[in-house]
Regions:
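Active-site-adjacent structural elements that line small-molecule/cofactor binding pockets in enzymes
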Residues: 1-306
């Protein structure tokens, strides 16, 4: 089992030193990856539509510090040279696909081939409206933009003729260090997300999903891979688990966090994830201050991680 640390680039704490301290601790303790999340802003008035909590509440406010994920990873890539650099997840329809591909490939080149592209469609209508992106078309746009990303990374003369975007007559260099492209880990666990992972993903990366539900979804994913003519064994299964906490439920979104309680409880849950096919867990550490989060990380290493 590999482990990553989710960094609070969407947070109420002072971001710069917190992100750097946590990334350096992740490197010191030999975590496999560090991860950031994606929003451009949080509205002052937000409907309770967050799909990964029982209440629909996001748990962030409009005045929290919201840092761009790609810029943040570029900053951290120059400070830590061990862990892979993941986005959990980049909301694909928010940004121009060519510019996004250029930023991702640049980061992959400058970091020595460490990028993991977690890819999602987004869920917040208010954010789509402000960015003048189509919420209704977000799934189809995501599919096209991911195809464009792969085309730009691999083709000598990239071309694409889609419903929402077309490219031709352009050179796209350099190509990424990772071949054929940085791995795409598709987020979400709706049927559409699973179908997307089966079609275009190098991995599947749902968030805040319990082991039993994940195991059921893996069975569905394997069937969809067979329909798409792909070997399901070639897809890496990962999951992000937020609010990792010792000694309590970790409950901040209306239901207990899967990785909470005693060290033995957490170990047992990790084993259930592993039995379901998970090979990489991203830990979202609960805490209001960096020192508190670092204590939890160190305790996880001492008492839980093999």
């Amino acid at each position: 089992m590999q482990f990553g640390i989710g960094l609070p680039n969407l947070s109420y704490v002072d971001p710069t030193q917190t992100l750097l301290s946590l990334a350096q601790v992740a490197q010191e303790l030999r975590f496999d990856s560090i991860w950031v999340s994606d929003h451009v802003f949080i509205p002052f008035e937000l409907a309770p539509n967050y799909p990964y909590s029982a209440t629909g509440q996001l748990g962030l406010s409009a005045t929290d510090h919201i840092l761009d994920p790609l810029t943040t990873l570029s900053f951290l890539a120059g400070r830590v040279d061990g862990p892979r650099l993941g986005i959990s997840v980049l909301i694909i329809p928010y940004r121009n696909p060519i510019v996004t591909a250029k930023m991702l490939v640049t980061l992959d080149v400058l970091s020595g081939g460490r990028v993991i592209l977690g890819a999602g469609t987004g869920w917040m209508p208010e954010e789509f409206a402000a960015l003048q992106a189509s919420y209704a078309d977000r799934g189809r746009v995501t599919d096209e933009y991911l195809d464009i990303f792969k085309e730009l990374c691999t083709a000598e003369k990239p071309t694409f003729d889609g419903q929402h975007y077309q490219i031709s007559n352009l050179g796209f260099y350099p190509k990424p260090i990772q071949k054929p492209h940085p791995p795409i880990w598709v987020g979400g666990y709706s049927k559409a997300a699973l179908r997307r992972a089966a079609r275009v993903g190098d991995g599947w990366h749902p968030s805040n999903i319990d082991p039993a539900t994940l195991a059921d979804k893996v069975n569905v994913l394997h069937g969809l891979c067979a329909e798409a003519g792909r070997d399901p064994a070639r897809l890496e299964i990962s999951t992000r688990v937020n609010n990792v906490a010792f000694g309590d439920s970790g409950d901040t979104v209306g239901r207990p966090a899967p990785l909470s309680g005693t060290a033995q409880n957490i170990i047992d849950t990790i084993r259930r994830y592993e039995d379901a096919g998970v090979s990489h867990i991203v830990l979202g550490i609960r805490g209001r201050e960096p020192e508190e989060m670092i204590r939890t990380i160190r305790r996880f290493v001492d008492e839980v991680r093999p």
